[in-house]
Amino acid sequence: MLKDIFTKKKKYASVPSDQAKHDVPEGIMTKCPKCKKIMLTKELDKNMRVCMNCDYHFPMNAKQRIESLMDEQSFEEFNQGMLSENPLGFPGYLEKLEKDREKTSLNEAVVTGKGTIGGHPAVVAVMDSSFRMGSMGSVVGEKITLAIEKAKADKVPFIIFTASGGARMQEGVLSLMQMAKTSSALKLFSEEQGLIISVMTHPTTGGVSASFASLGDYNFAEPGALIGFAGRRIIEQTIGEKLPEDFQTAEFLLKHGQLDAVIHRDDMKKTLENLLDMHQTGGDIEWLQD
């Protein structure tokens, strides 16, 4: 019996090969960057891309955003055929645009259209950071301007969801010009008593944050969204000081009076419905402070 203990055959565990490790289809699981929990992507999508464990708000593409907000089958897109060119002859720019078109099934970094939210008509623009990081080039600026003009002509509110790394460097000063163009269009719309609602999502930075994203009658943001003009390290190096940990977050901006509210994605549609209803029928906004 004692002899058997020392002569017992060793057992070995089999280690999966590299090929076996890759048998899990890409994209079926998603890891939360905040709490590190791994979850099924389809379950995350069902939860409007909000982590079920820590409430982290993952980026949404334009299609997902529109489906989560607009009344069913009410959204009609316009100007979807507009395509960016390469006015400065920037090397490789057209190839990058084509690659993003194939990856996202979008022609540009913003989707614009008209539909209803809770039965209330509105023109909506939704930026998509998966296309050139949501950067603002000539076509993005033109589509947003045309959407504002459409809202003005139809006398309906204009709602924009921003997600952008800023102006598109491959278009140089032409992209920077979109800051003035979109801001001017919003000014003219506002003079006609048009309602402007801006919702800043992660990330909203650079020239976008410094122009139309901050010009709403109501400026909202999603929890944890990065919002700012220059990068954190650049600011610290310029002023020679360490910035607060929560600097440039939605919560920091709310605390310092630069936002009207930080709204959880679950509450976004109802909040917009209430606002649109209030501006159509009259009322107060005390509920927004709850």
Swiss-Prot record:
Pfam families the UniProt entry points to: Carboxyl_trans, Zn_ribbon_ACC
Enzyme Commission (EC) number: 2.1.3.15
Pathway: Lipid metabolism; malonyl-CoA biosynthesis; malonyl-CoA from acetyl-CoA: step 1/1
Keywords in alphabetical order: ATP-binding, Cytoplasm, Fatty acid biosynthesis, Fatty acid metabolism, Lipid biosynthesis, Lipid metabolism, Metal-binding, Nucleotide-binding, Transferase, Zinc, Zinc-finger
Annotated compartments: Cytoplasm
InterPro entries linked: AcCoA_carboxyl_beta (IPR034733), Acetyl_CoA_COase_Trfase_b_su (IPR000438), ClpP/crotonase-like_dom_sf (IPR029045), COA_CT_N (IPR011762), Znf-ACC (IPR041010)
Residue intervals of the CoA carboxyltransferase N-terminal domain: 28-290
GO annotation terms (biological process): malonyl-CoA biosynthetic process; mycolic acid biosynthetic process
Residues that coordinate or bind Zn(2+): 32, 35, 51, 54
Catalytic activity: N(6)-carboxybiotinyl-L-lysyl-[protein] + acetyl-CoA = N(6)-biotinyl-L-lysyl-[protein] + malonyl-CoA
Molecular-function GO terms, alphabetical: acetyl-CoA carboxylase activity; ATP binding; carboxyl- or carbamoyltransferase activity; zinc ion binding
First-level EC class: transferase
Zinc finger map (C4-type): 32-54
Quaternary structure and partners: Acetyl-CoA carboxylase is a heterohexamer composed of biotin carboxyl carrier protein (AccB), biotin carboxylase (AccC) and two subunits each of ACCase subunit alpha (AccA) and ACCase subunit beta (AccD).
Protein name: Acetyl-coenzyme A carboxylase carboxyl transferase subunit beta
Organism for this UniProt entry: Bacillus subtilis (strain 168)
Lineage: Bacteria, Bacillati, Bacillota, Bacilli, Bacillales
